[in-house]
Amino acid sequence: MFEKLINQIKELSTIDFKEATEKIRKYIDEISEEDFNEIVKQIGTIPENIEHDSTEEKLYSKASDIVLARCFRLLGLASRALDERADSADILAESISGYKYSLVADAKCFRLSRTAKNQKDFKVSNLSDWRGSENEYAVLVAPYFQYPQSTSQIYSKALENNVCLLSWEHISILLEKM
């Protein structure tokens, strides 16, 4: 199923970005939960056949936002990927039960070939700023293998700014338990 998503992204990369985004949103929202869960397990890694700094890569990133928004919906939140691209959160989610809270989230994807990560790649402080006064929480989701294995500014920034760090693997496990 992941390969089908990649093929969709490649095919749609030649049309208007907004139109391509809507088609990808429709595709992701309509696939079965079983197929969707397979995508969740792989979405954190950008395939090398997606061109660097290309429309394909931007669409892949947008697809990851749409995937995370659907994950939050499956976990019981009202959620959507936002259209804004620069200097704002990618996803907004709100509780729909008795608890009234909202969160902003950022979905991160990296290439396996990417080894030099630094805290700027994760934008933890920015995510906290994007939360603003109207959202209680901020969540960053990235591939587990891309988080540093020892002390890092990423962790201290997350603690300082009250940003929850999750991995795509954590999200996948939560979805399996539903």
Report each predicted region and the residues it spans.
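Structural motif
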Residues: 83, 109, 141-145
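Charged, structured surface patches that assemble and position nucleic-acid processing machinery
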Residues: 154-178
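Nucleic-acid nuclease catalytic cores
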Residues: 132-159
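Substrate-engagement module of ASCE P-loop NTPases
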Residues: 126-131
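Interdomain/boundary linker segments immediately adjacent to catalytic/signaling cores
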Residues: 1-59
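Active-site beta-strand-loop-beta-strand hairpin of nuclease catalytic cores
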Residues: 93-104
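A short acidic/basic microdomain associated with nuclease active sites
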Residues: 69-91
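Active-site-adjacent loop/helix micro-motif of nuclease/hydrolase catalytic cores
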Residues: 111-125, 148-150
